[in-house]
Amino acid sequence: MSGPVALKQPMTPVASAAASTEPVLQVRDVQAHFRTHHFGVSRDVRAVDGVTFDVRRNEIYGLAGESSSGKTTLIKTIAGAIKPPLEVVGGSIRFSFLPDYPGLHAAPPEVLERVRWRHLSYVMQGSMNVLNPMRRVIDTFRDFAWRHIGGSRRAFEERVADHVSRVRLDPAVLRAYPHELSGGMRQRVTIALATICKPEFIIADEPTTALDVIVQKDVLGMIRGIQREMGSSVLFVTHDMGVHAHLTDRLGIMYGGRLVEEAPTPEVFARPLHPYTTYLIGSLPRIGDDTPRKSLEGSPPNLADPPPGCRFHPRCPLAMDICSRQVPPMVETLPGHRVACHAVNPGAAA
């Protein structure tokens, strides 16, 4: 077993515009496949297939896309939450606070013990059901956070009580069991749990799923407020484009296990370049607009046997012959605006 590995101290938020471009996370050509072997037959599901992007210091980076686009598999890979049959088969995932490993999946257990919760936390999909129903809320905080924060039991509990107050919860909830709390309260508890150690990086997977609109708005405002206060970076995943419009700073669009467009969020909504992004934005309801919404024909690709070339071409209204033959490269078409589309970037694949 390797010896102790020293980790960098938590970073302080940087106010200057130039410094804000410094990446906290660098994802490079990551490939993560579900590999199964049954009755002599091997099967690879290419859930994440060559994804590259950065998350900058003190920003909220959004990932959008329909179900089965690879969003959740990608963030599980980034978080190191990998279990068979999922395997990382290529690429690298480097955090600024852990530069010596090509991903958490490659780090030894003693390093993961130091990193998780203290430097990186993960609000999982369906996190309202993650809390242990047999333990009071304060016990869950002790289980995950006390070893990182240290101090006496009394000092720790006072810090937790102060922190849950920041997410607009009465500290009395700490003595409650999860089933005694509403859905919105449990979600606030999980967000408080993910931020109690003031991590540099937070991954949030569909944190507003199953919440009503009023509670959802409150939770989103709370996430933004805590992120600004701590200066953390957030990788925020949801299929809801309306949520991205109100919360994220930059937005990546995934389709068929690949990133197809990335830009500052206002730019994505004002000037979508990829046909799939245009469809996602066009499907949003608008007050006073009774125009029928046209559905996208076809089905998402089978990632165990994906179509050649661009994976969107069987459903794309702009598809050309080259689309079925060559994978479109991700090209910076406008400053800070990348897109992978032959129709938008003709000749880029040559």
Locate the predicted segments by residue.
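Short catalytic/signature loops enriched in Gly
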Residues: P13, A17-P23, H37, Y101, ...
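ABC transporter nucleotide-binding domains
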Residues: M1-A270, V339, N345-A350
